[in-house]
C-alpha cells in the first residue's frame, strides 16, 4: 500500500456506529468523513475496507474510551479489540488515543455550527473522530 501525504484515519468506536475522520499530519488538519453503521451486530468491514483502500492512511487512530478516573469500562475492551482487528486486517500501525469528553465537545461544535439540526448521532460520531484525531496530532507535535 502506498501512503499519501502522511494521511491519517481516526475511528470513534461505538457499538452501533463508528465515526470516521481523515487528517493530514503535514497540515495538522482533519475533517469528518462519515459514520459506519454495524451490520448484524458487527462493524461493516466492507465499508471500513473501502475507506482504508481509498485513503491509504499511514496511521490509524482509534479512540480509547476511559472513565474519567482513567479506568477501563466495557467499551474500552471492545475498542481495543476493534483496534487489534484493524491492525490484523490492514497490517498498518494502529494507535489508541484517549477520547474522554469527545462526544460532549463534538455536540458543542455541531450545535454552534448547525443548531439542533447538527445533533444527529452520525454527525456526532464523525465529529468525535475529528476531535480524537486533532488531539492525537496535537499530542505528537507538542512532544517534539
From Swiss-Prot:
GO cellular component: cytosol
EC number: 3.1.-.-
Coiled-coil annotated spans: none
UniProt keyword annotation of Hydrolase present: yes
Broadest EC class assigned to this enzyme: hydrolase
Keywords, ordered alphabetically: Cytoplasm, Hydrolase, Nuclease, Ribosome biogenesis
Subcellular locations according to the entry: Cytoplasm
InterPro entries assigned to the protein according to its UniProt record, in alphabetical order: RNaseH-like_sf, YqgF, YqgF/RNaseH-like_dom, YqgF/RNaseH-like_dom_sf
CDD domains, A to Z: YqgF (cd16964)
Keyword Nuclease annotated: yes
GO molecular-function terms, A-Z: nuclease activity
A Pfam short name: RuvX
GO BP: any one term: rRNA 5'-end processing
Summary of the function given for this chain in its UniProt record: Could be a nuclease involved in processing of the 5'-end of pre-16S rRNA.
Similarity-based family: Belongs to the YqgF nuclease family.
Protein's UniProt name: Putative pre-16S rRNA nuclease
Lineage: Bacteria, Pseudomonadati, Pseudomonadota, Gammaproteobacteria, Enterobacterales
Amino acid at each position: 500500500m502506498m501512503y499519501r501525504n502522511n494521511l491519517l484515519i481516526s475511528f470513534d468506536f461505538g457499538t452501533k456506529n463508528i465515526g470516521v475522520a481523515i487528517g493530514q499530519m503535514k497540515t495538522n488538519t482533519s475533517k469528518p468523513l462519515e459514520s459506519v453503521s454495524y451490520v448484524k451486530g458487527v462493524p461493516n468491514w466492507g465499508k471500513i475496507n473501502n475507506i482504508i483502500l481509498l485513503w491509504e492512511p499511514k496511521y490509524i487512530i482509534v479512540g480509547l474510551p476511559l472513565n474519567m478516573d482513567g479506568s477501563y469500562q466495557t467499551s474500552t475492551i471492545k475498542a481495543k479489540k476493534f483496534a487489534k482487528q484493524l491492525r490484523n486486517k490492514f497490517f498498518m500501525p494502529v494507535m489508541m488515543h484517549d477520547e474522554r469528553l469527545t462526544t460532549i465537545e463534538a455536540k458543542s461544535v455541531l450545535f454552534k455550527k448547525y443548531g439542533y439540526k447538527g445533533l444527529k448521532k452520525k454527525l456526532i460520531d464523525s465529529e468525535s473522530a475529528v476531535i480524537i484525531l486533532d488531539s492525537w496530532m496535537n499530542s505528537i507535535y507538542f512532544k517534539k
